[in-house]
Amino acid sequence: MVVNNRANVAAIGIGSAGIKIVSLLSRKSLLVDRFSYISCDDGDFSTVDLKDTIMIESPVDQKLTPAMVRGLALGSRARIMDAVGDARVVFVIAGMGGATGSGLAPFVASVAQDCGAVAVGVAIMPFEFEKRTRFYAGVSLRRLRESSKGVVVVDNEILMRSTSDDTTLADLYDTANKAAVKALSSILLQSKEGSKALGLNKLLGTVIQDGYTLLSVSSSGTAEKAEDALAGAVVSLGKLADPKKATRAVVSLNGDSSLTAPEVGLVVERLGSATGSQALDVEYGVDYTGSAQLQLSLLASGFSSTKYDDYDPLAKVLGERVLDDEMDFALPEGLEILQPCD
């Protein structure tokens, strides 16, 4: 798919994690023209302009499921369509596992597609210790893939380096969100003097493929920083899926003036052999506004199977034999009789 690099691009953050990430992205110079935010909790809007928000309200105080959140969001469909507007490309960014992100991400992506936009889901997957959220995350990831032209999967566990013993849970989430922003912003960077941006077409050419696109990050400040960062990114990718199954990739290098052309060439030339996918189609971008610590962000696509298959055991067992796998919509108990069916 070819899209004008100056096409109208929107990003929609959903739920706590999605809103925090999109809010931080909005402060950077990216290939995104406008930003919107959707949540069931008005506390999520504390760092954003309220005119860009859509609040999904529930008249009853009840723990919501993803299906209930979608049911409540039906009344806001027109406002979501307004948020999409005339965008040619819409990035739908949400944390998977909670009711809001899991429920709304596939729904918002389907609305964007209905509006004629290219919907690209960005799914933030839960930490390993958040085992109770895995089922919601797995089901929502699959439905987001069905509702979008492509899905980028961001794994919180992969984003995190070693943390100290006194790290709080809030600090852990904050650090993961900032790491996601750093990686995503390097890939969505606008062209500027002295740097080589990827551009929208190259990004979409990688993401809009069968299966899933996986994000892997690594950094190094050693004398062999390019080789070390590449190795680290491939190792991280291998924790999510079989690297040999990758068909396309974009790699973004963020460093300073010490990053040499031979080092950039080494990463691009060796990525195929490092993943074991010799026919890998590689695009790349370079940003020299970073530090001597090289950050490498890798997007690899074409994965039909990932570690997240185990998050949705029913789909794994039944496969294509699932009889009814459409998105379900529900309402909190007591509201069903208040809502017309037409």
Where are these regions (language model features)?
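Tubulin/FtsZ superfamily GTPase core signature
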Residues: 1-342
